[in-house]
């Protein structure tokens, strides 16, 4: 999608780290043991798998978002179908092959499947298929509303990670060096195409002018270009809009 190499490397590492975390969590999924009003009896509350779940991920994190969903979903005992974004299909295929090979080597066949296609062709089928007890969607708020409405209409469950309008608050005693460094990357990283992208700075009057001058100077140093060049911060936009 044009992401710079360091961000791409970080995304793969995030998938690995999530898998490590999920392994630990797999031994922590328990229920409650409750006392009963009947002498000599106890009540047990136990979590059970949903069954099959569908994962629809976005273009901006084509690897990591799938990792969060699949790693946690699998250790909860679910099977899943993952539809990556149609514009990052090579990532979906590559990650899917690696994960499938690892699962097969450990005796887990046919628990993880990928499928390709557009939202209207494939995604809509996820929303209406009653065999998918849960649909996890990452994308725009507008589409998220549609997903929630359609899946809840058949009494399915949803996990929605949608767009944001994020702000940073800068108080008079803030470390401006840290604000500058963090804000520039938060706003310009991934070409500003993240749900967590910084869109607004709420700055106290006493430091506004000083921060504005430093921010303008910092933006002039941002290198736009080849995402494989280590000095590049902003690669090509994914889409013009």
Each language-model region and where it sits:
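Structural signal for hydrophobic packing residues in well-ordered secondary-structure cores
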Residues: 1, 16, 22-30, 96-99, ...
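N-terminal Rossmann-like NAD(P)+-binding subdomain of aldehyde/semialdehyde dehydrogenases
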Residues: 1-41, 234, 238
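Short loop-to-helix capping motifs
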Residues: 3-4, 129, 140, 204
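Short histidine/acidic/glycine/proline-rich micro-motifs that form metal-
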Residues: 3-5, 86-89, 201
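A generic "alpha-helical surface" signal
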Residues: 10-13, 17, 64, 90, ...
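Rossmann-like NAD(P) dinucleotide-binding subdomain of oxidoreductase/dehydrogenase enzymes
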Residues: 21, 31-178
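ALDH superfamily catalytic-core signature
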Residues: 142-241
């Amino acid at each position: 999608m044009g992401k710079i190499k360091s961000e791409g490397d970080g995304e793969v590492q995030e998938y690995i780290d999530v898998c490590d975390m999920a392994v630990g969590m797999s031994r922590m999924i328990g229920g409650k043991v409750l006392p009963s009003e009947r002498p000599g009896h106890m009540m047990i509350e136990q979590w059970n798998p949903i069954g099959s779940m569908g994962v629809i991920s976005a273009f901006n994190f084509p690897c990591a978002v799938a990792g969060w969903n699949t790693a946690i979903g699998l250790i909860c005992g679910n099977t899943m179908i993952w539809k990556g974004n149609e514009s990052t299909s090579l990532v979906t295929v590559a990650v899917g092959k690696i994960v499938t090979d690892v699962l097969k080597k450990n005796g887990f066949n046919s628990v993880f499947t990928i499928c390709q296609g557009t939202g209207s062709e494939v995604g809509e089928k996820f929303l209406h298929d009653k065999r998918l007890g849960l649909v996890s969607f990452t994308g725009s708020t507008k589409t998220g509303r549609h997903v929630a409405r359609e899946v809840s209409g058949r009494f399915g469950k949803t996990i929605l990670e949608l767009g944001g309008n994020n702000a940073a608050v800068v108080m008079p005693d803030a470390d401006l060096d840290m604000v500058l460094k963090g804000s520039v990357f938060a706003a310009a990283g991934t070409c500003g195409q993240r749900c967590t992208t910084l869109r607004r700075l709420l700055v106290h009057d006493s430091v506004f002018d000083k921060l504005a001058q430093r921010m303008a100077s910092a933006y002039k140093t941002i290198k736009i270009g080849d995402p494989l060049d280590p000095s590049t911060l902003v690669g090509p936009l994914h889409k013009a809009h």
